[in-house]
Amino acid sequence: MEPLYFFISFEPSHLFTRINAGVLLDFIYGRKGTLLNCNADSVASAVALGAAEIAPTDLVFCFEKAGVLRNPDDDTSLIREITAATYPPLKADGVVSKGMIPKIENALKAVEKGVRSVTIRSSENLSNGIGTVIRNS
């Protein structure tokens, strides 16, 4: 396994062009040019934190469901809001599990450190307000 390095090299103009377009792809390469696995939510959260130092920032995570669901098989079981106080019981009860855990934990860290809100929603719901909003308590 290739060791991880914490040095990032990038072309700033490429990053700003993508941010201004509202899209950020997270292709991460190792020292030898090999493509590495990277959590896109972690990258998006880090970029949002940087943006929050400059201007009020809201972050949206898009995926295939309308948001965080109490029952993954029931699209009407949407949880409208999650905070640092309401998250632990959801995790303990298994309502939040698997890949949703890092998504919500990244969102909670982002709002704790200055991002106004993080919304988890389907790309089909970008303009209609449907989704789960993660807020600071």
Regions found by a protein language model. Give the residues of each.
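C-terminal catalytic "cap/lid" subdomain
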Residues: 1-137
